[in-house]
Curated annotation (Swiss-Prot):
This is Phenylalanine-4-hydroxylase. Its EC number is 1.14.16.1, 1.14.16.4. It comes from the Eukaryota. Belongs to the biopterin-dependent aromatic amino acid hydroxylase family. Expressed in the seam cells of the lateral hypodermis, in the ventral hypodermis and in the hyp7 hypodermal syncytium, in hypodermal cells in the tail and in body wall muscle cells (at protein level). It catalyses: (6R)-L-erythro-5,6,7,8-tetrahydrobiopterin + L-phenylalanine + O2 = (4aS,6R)-4a-hydroxy-L-erythro-5,6,7,8-tetrahydrobiopterin + L-tyrosine; (6R)-L-erythro-5,6,7,8-tetrahydrobiopterin + L-tryptophan + O2 = 5-hydroxy-L-tryptophan + (4aS,6R)-4a-hydroxy-L-erythro-5,6,7,8-tetrahydrobiopterin. It comes from Caenorhabditis elegans.
Amino acid sequence: MPPAGQDDLDFLKYAMESYVADVNADIGKTTIVFTLREKAGALAETLKLFQAHDVNLSHIESRPSKTHEGCYEVLVEFAEAEDHRKIEGVIEHFQQKAEKKVLVQDWNTKNKQNKDSVPWFPQKINDIDQFANRILSYGAELDADHPGFKDMTYRERRKFFADIAFNFKHGDKIPTITYTDEEIATWRTVYNELTVMYPKNACQEFNYIFPLLQQNCGFGPDRIPQLQDVSDFLKDCTGYTIRPVAGLLSSRDFLAGLAFRVFHSTQYIRHHSAPKYTPEPDICHELLGHVPLFADVEFAQFSQEIGLASLGAPDDVIEKLATLYWFTIEFGICQQDGEKKAYGAGLLSSFGELQYALSDKPEVVDFDPAVCCVTKYPITEYQPKYFLAESFASAKNKLKSWAATINRPFQIRYNAYTQRVEILDKVAALQRLARDIRSDISTLEEALGKVNNLKMK
């Protein structure tokens, strides 16, 4: 029963945790999934909402929620013949009453996207469990032109790594891997050829951090570092963690991980027959290209800003953000002491392109997110154009200014204490933010006062 003094529909704000709505025009059905706290009468009172909007349900099912403790998820379906204005009324009421909004997912009518639609996005770090296994390619399956396609031993090994990733959940420890002599030999070839190039070609931040990885994570030619050791190191440095993944994720899912300072990393290594070539990201690319700079505070923040900008963004913006990621985190160069230096992982894990990118052969232009995000690029050959950043801090500020233009009907912020994304769409949320800002300003003022007192002594 509703609390005293509350009507049936207002009861939802006490009972409902979240909702997801999906209209599939191809099969002529509308689906809404909502999460209810386990309370007597919660489902019955919630279903009255559909009755109030004169919507006839064709299917109902429920199950215990895997992501909300003490709750259960309810799926309801109704036919395409239902008046979409009624459906929109239901969605609008959910938006008003759900305590933790999971906004409308792919809300479309006859393949036309509703102006108020917002794709589903994770709001807490363990929500990543819901999409981490939605890989697009590779994993245990290989294309016919892959160097390891005909090697059944290699393919079995890939399945072993894929199973680890598929069974991983947030909070788990990444299993320790005993790499084979053949795998270590492949790593050694890549490691030895790349590391001699870093002092001259990599950015200062990379060259500062790399020796720390050698000291703390066992980076060296004769041992492939363990992802859990690397994840622990990054956690101490910038709050980033590593999560094993079986293969390529969609741009939306991969960028969503960055929003929570989670980097999805493969554990498998390229085929031994082609140590200088890989058609996909492998552990050499992840550890030698990506990992070092995730330990740098400015770069870590820059990467997270791309992830945060992706949450709830429409598909066209995701494409632009993926392009920004490509030209920065994968193939970015920066200016240091009057020279071009590489900071992109695709460059720092590639023998030939690292030298090519810093030569006079390609076109180099200043980093401008508005231009960068719509620039076409090849995937299977060297880049004809690179974007030059003044610094990570400068690139981050430019990105934030550009991201502010994204048409998203709400603002978000990342709460590092709870590892949640907070939607700033209610007065209470804004008041909490204001209190946090006041507290930080107070801490800053006290620290400045103490520093000034020390100078005067």
